[in-house]
Amino acid sequence: MSKDLSKVRNIGISAHIDSGKTTLTERILFYTDRIHAIHEVRGKDGVGAKMDSMELEKERGITIQSAATFCNWKGTDINIIDTPGHVDFTVEVERALRVLDGAVLVLCSVGGVQSQSITVNRQMTRYNVPRIAFINKCDRTGANPAKVTGQLQEKLQLNAHMMQMPIGLEGDLVGMVDLVTMKAVYYEGENGDEIRITDIPAEMLDEATEKRETLLEEISMFSEELMEALLEDSENVDIDLIYKAVRQGTIALEFTPVFMGSAYKNKGVQALLDAVETYLPCPTDVENIGLDLDNEETEFAVTNNDEDPLIMLAFKLEDGRYGQLTYVRTYQGQLTKGDTVYNRRTGRKVKIGRLCRMHSDEMEEIDGVGSGDIVALFGVDCASGDTFTNDAVNCSMTSMHVPEPVISLSIKPIDNKAQINMSKALNRFTKEDPTFRTFVDHETNETIISGMGELHLEVYVERMKREYAAEVEVGKPQVSYRETITQRAEFNYTHKKQTGGTGQFGRVAGYMEPLDEGDYEFVDKIVGGAIPREFISSCDKGFQKSLVKGHLCGAGITGVRCVINDGSFHAVDSSDVAFQIASVGAFKDGYMKAKPVIMEPIMKVSVEGPSEFQGAVMGSINQRRGMIIGSNEEGTYSVIEAEVPLSEMFGYSTTLRSLTQGKAEFTMEFANFKPVPKTVGDNLIKAHEEERKNG
């Protein structure tokens, strides 16, 4: 079961939507003999790309779930996670990056570094993922890989350098110049699988020599051996020294090699596969950190050793045609069919029935797996982000960063059968996607779903219908507002109830103040036993209950520190419940004195389209209470960056289409919360009061 980990690569393919990422994965599977025919993403043959296995994905031509697949290139096992490019699905990208050792950042040679490329790059940086860049679509009109490499340096602050030069561009693209071997590589034959290597065309030699000198100078910083070799004889440097230096720089996150081609036209993909094998790290090159649960979550380095106790992380759940699949990454130790492992979050024992490698939605059963690998398990009940170990170790892998949802919808099943199916669907979706939340609003008795954007929720409503036959009526999208306080305020509240028998008594006093970071903090400054120790946590519970619904517009309260410094109790009548009720009253007493305000989610919006529509687009953003934070023009194309309240963005795609004749597109992601203007706040308060009267 043990395998040579230097021959394993766990990689992700991440990009902006429509950069040709799924097409690239499709070609990789073809060249590594995993599939024997090529299908396009929006293919006329009705098959769709291999990695887009959900019906919804084939229809929309976007990748929603990050399918994991396995292939082998020249003796190296490669696990590929194909991640969604749409900003509403960023949690899928984050989850994939958490378990990967390296990544390929795919860019469009015309669009260059777009808004989602910036988001993905930021996520890669957060998880210290070494990356190589692939500039795709070099066959398109306006292709300019040199310009895109410049954008990688300027916009993403990456030390990016071209490892190749295109031979011909746009419709004339026939191959690449390899700047390491100084050879011309042509991709011929119907599927680009006949590779011809020749000398560099004479007219390109000077430029190639110059670019190679720059490249060698840059990477010599990562290898003393290479630096010495260059000083001795820069014309005849050992190629292996170059490969080694690029690898060292890439793994240290100090260098980003740039490759190029056209996946659609079958050019440059094999060189990218060589680069994955040569430059991206194997599991032992990367340090993964675990938290020791027996020692106050002290960090420790995971070993990648098969002989050590098992540690693995569930990073994705899927309900496919084979039942529930749990994708796991093994960090150390071995797992064999029939083993019993422990879910460290729930404390439950789990018996492993079947193990398999997934190839998009087809599977290949295996008997066991060693450290550093990615596999799928059957029938394991868990949530995404759970850590599994054997009984010799009690630890957790660091939890993943999960953004807060910003948009909500009410959904109502059309009949009883739909109600039952909807419950099943929601139970599964919340387990597999931590940014998808659901709750029942007891005042209106409606089921509310929350997520990262309109498309995110649309996809789940659609999946309910398709996968669970749960027909639901969908309400209008609702913005997730928040309430917070702006100044310190004292509170002092006594709860007293006497109705025969044991009564209730509790007094809570102290103050609340704005909290700069975080949602809520409880501080106990009680001295001299004014409130007995056993009731301190009751006060905390009461305050937390108060945060659920604010007094202005009914939104959740955030950014509050509650400090208790006095109180009183009764030897007989004081209880847990009495102090919880007293704390709720104390919170109410202080809240309105603390000058509360309503906060709304602000989105970072990026609009890309022809420059001729720039004025109209800016006007449409200003009308939506937006603030333009930057714009730049590149030829006939312009990109406008703005911050706009989410409540103003509903239906914007329709507006933008009609303003720009369908030629512009926009992406948005959550930026921050800001106080609403007075008029908007007054309307929200009024609407909330009306609702309460009618409710």
Curated annotation (Swiss-Prot):
Any one GO cellular component localisation term in the record: cytoplasm
InterPro entries given in the database record: EFG_II, EFG_III, EFG_III/V, EFG_IV, EFG_V-like, EFTu-like_2, G_TR_CS, P-loop_NTPase
Coiled coil: none
S-S bonds: none
Statement: the UniProt record of this protein carries the keyword Nucleotide-binding: yes
A Pfam family this chain is assigned to: EFG_C
This protein's record includes keyword GTP-binding: yes
Keywords annotated in UniProt: Cytoplasm, Elongation factor, GTP-binding, Nucleotide-binding, Protein biosynthesis
Similarity-based family: Belongs to the TRAFAC class translation factor GTPase superfamily. Classic translation factor GTPase family. EF-G/EF-2 subfamily.
Protein name: Elongation factor G 1
